[in-house]
A protein has these predicted regions:
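Domain-length accessory/inserted modules outside core catalytic folds
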Residues: 1-127
C-alpha cells in the first residue's frame, strides 16, 4: 500500500502563492509561516527559481517576501524592523506593494497618521 504525504495547510498556501506569482496574478506576496517550515519553504522557493527575502516575525514565525528582485530590494530598505513598528508611510508603501486595496490602504494610512499625530511609538521613526 502506498503511503501519501500530508502537506500542511501553510505549505498549500505557499504553493498557491507560487502559482499566482508564476501566472502573473500577483507581483509580490508576503507569506508568514511557523519557523518549523523554513527548510521546506526555502527549498520549494529555490526549486521554483523564486526570489525572496526572509525575515523573522516574532518568536515563532517567519515572513517570506516573494517576488521580483526590484520589489525585494525595496523591501530590504523599507522593512527594517517588525511590521507593527513600521511608520504609517512604510506601512502604506508595503501594503500597496503587496497589492492590497488602494482605497483601504489610503484609509488605513489616514487613520494611523491622524490617530497619533506623530507622537506615539508607532510614529517615532516618521520623518
Amino acid at each position: 500500500m502506498r503511503q501519501t504525504e500530508i502537506t500542511p495547510i501553510e505549505m498549500k498556501v505557499l504553493m498557491n502563492h507560487i502559482y499566482e506569482l508564476q501566472k502573473g496574478v500577483r507581483q509580490m506576496v508576503l507569506f508568514t509561516c511557523p519557523k518549523q517550515y523554513e527548510a521546506y519553504a526555502t527549498k520549494r522557493l529555490c526549486s521554483q527559481n523564486m526570489d525572496f527575502v526572509l525575515q523573522p516575525a516574532g518568536k515563532n514565525n517567519l515572513n517570506f517576501y516573494i517576488g521580483c528582485k526590484e520589489c525585494l530590494n525595496a523591501i530590504r530598505l523599507i522593512v527594517t524592523r517588525p511590521l507593527n513598528e513600521l511608520t504609517p508611510e512604510e506601512d502604506f508603501i508595503l501594503g500597496t506593494m503587496l497589492g492590497y486595496d488602494l482605497c483601504a490602504q489610503c484609509e488605513r494610512y489616514c487613520e494611523r497618521k491622524t490617530a497619533c499625530k506623530g507622537r506615539c511609538d508607532k510614529c517615532q521613526h516618521a520623518q
